[in-house]
Swiss-Prot record:
Catalyzes the reversible cyclization of carbamoyl aspartate to dihydroorotate. PANTHER family: ALLANTOINASE (PTHR43668:SF2). The active site is at 304. GO terms for cellular component: cytoplasm. One of its GO terms (biological process) is 'de novo' UMP biosynthetic process. This is Dihydroorotase. It comes from Staphylococcus epidermidis (strain ATCC 35984 / DSM 28319 / BCRC 17069 / CCUG 31568 / BM 3577 / RP62A). Pathway: Pyrimidine metabolism; UMP biosynthesis via de novo pathway; (S)-dihydroorotate from bicarbonate: step 3/3.
């Protein structure tokens, strides 16, 4: 057994002194004081820090199989554990794509061998993510895939998405969509706006995203499918999603930390660590995302952790791949910028990473109570640390946040009662 002493948990937004007794994989007792006298109890001192439920990230890229030079299941899940995440859902833009039962089983075998946290894999919507032929939804649903997505590309035709949603509704699985109309991206490498004009870099307009969301919410209404929108980035998208929810359509949405924190004006020049898809938008868009998150239009936060090799990101923005890493920095950045400055409560931020994503995807994680799995993270809210690439457990360090000083860093993460990350003393 393990006993976590000298910790604090959130109860209705208030920090309460708490001790947690863990028996095997599950929580046996949560109380302000636990009298457990046994020689076989391992005591973990939380040092007055927050004990939060293990975070749930419904959008990561682990790159394996096929992209191991960028990240592996092992390195990506070590990074997740360092960031406080105990459950991650990897996207299917791997080689091979998890578009058959055989490929999903091969992926699960790899996960069982090296993953440091719980990994719930997506299956693709279309074979090879090519957008021309649907996967076998029934067989893949029976195999227990998390949901269906072609993330990395948008499903380009309404007829294909309509057919996919009908199948997904039939097997009671969500469709998770990267929304991007290829006919409207114009080879862009950042947001189409004043900054892209100043830098002479082709831009992607807001409409490339919002047009596809508008199409898809109507298809979701027609099919009864649960439709989840990845990494919302524009004010128009927020408006469409808000209206869809008011109409009773089963739509949910996520936003990334970088779209909440940065805008096109933060792009210093031709620096590919600021290249992600969707791109950093205008400040008006960022404010709409913050409003949408707080009013419930956007349901949760997901990192879109997208590692790339250093030589890939050293290329100009027009040639470098899209994406930045985020697993190890997400909570500290948002805690520092929004909670410490009084814009959000600590309870709100923790919920965006735990109970909110778990609830919308019907996962029995993201909360701490008697008999639940002992998935948790201990977080130091008071010590400032600098984000340094040499501290990353990910194979990649492609992020614009290197050098930022942040609070709210996890010091220990536990999955099913086993420590999967502990800060070096």
């Amino acid at each position: 057994m393990k006993l976590i002493k000298n910790g604090k948990i959130l109860k209705n937004g208030i920090l309460k002194d708490t001790e947690i007794l863990i028996d095997g994989k599950r929580i046996k007792q949560i109380s302000s004081k636990i009298n457990a006298s046994s020689s076989n109890i391992e005591v973990i001192d939380a040092k007055g820090n927050l004990i939060a439920p293990g975070f749930v990230d419904v959008h990561v890229h682990l790159r394996e199989p096929g992209g191991e030079h960028k990240e592996t299941i092992e390195s990506g899940t070590k990074a997740a554990a360092r960031g406080g995440f105990t459950t991650v859902c990897p996207m299917p833009n791997t080689r091979p794509v998890p578009d058959t039962v055989e490929h999903v089983r091969e992926l699960r075998q790899r996960i069982s061998e090296t993953a440091q946290v719980r990994v719930l894999p997506y299956a693709a919507i279309t074979k090879r993510q090519a957008g021309t032929e649907l996967v076998d939804f029934e067989k893949l649903a029976l195999e227990g895939v998390f949901a269906f997505t072609d993330d990395g590309v948008g499903v380009q035709t309404a007829s294909m998405m309509y057919a996919a949603m009908k199948q997904a509704a039939k097997v009671k699985k969500p469709i998770v969509a990267h929304c991007e109309d290829n006919s409207l991206i114009y080879g862009g490498a950042m947001h189409k706006g004043k900054r892209s004009e100043e830098l002479g870099i082709p831009g992607i307009p807001n409409i490339a995203e919002s047009v596809q969301i508008a199409r898809d919410v109507l298809l979701a209404e027609a099919t009864g499918c649960h439709y989840h929108v990845c990494h919302v980035s524009t004010k128009e998208s927020v408006r469409v999603i808000r209206d869809a929810k008011k109409a009773g359509i089963h739509v949910t949405a996520e936003v990334t930390p970088h779209h909440l924190l940065l805008t096109e004006n933060d792009v210093p020049g031709d620096d590919s660590n600021y290249k992600m898809n969707p791109p950093l938008r205008s400040n008006e868009d960022r404010e709409a995302l913050l409003e949408g998150l707080l009013d419930g239009t956007i349901d949760c936060i997901a990192t879109d952790h997208a590692p790339h090799a250093k030589e890939e990101k050293e290329q100009p923005m027009t040639k470098a791949p899209f994406g930045i890493v985020g697993s190890e920095t997400a909570f500290p950045l948002l805690y520092t910028h929004f909670v410490r400055r009084g814009n959000w409560s600590l309870q709100q931020l923790v919920d965006y990473f735990t109970i909110k994503p778990a609830t919308i995807f019907n996962l029995n994680y993201g909360k701490l109570h008697k008999d639940s799995y002992a998935d948790l993270t201990i977080i130091d809210l008071n010590t400032e640390k600098e984000i340094k690439s040499e501290d990353f457990l990910s194979k990649a360090d492609n992020t614009p946040f290197i050098g930022e000083k942040v609070y709210g860093n996890p010091t220990l993460t536990m999955l099913k009662g086993e420590v999967v990350f502990e800060e070096e003393k």
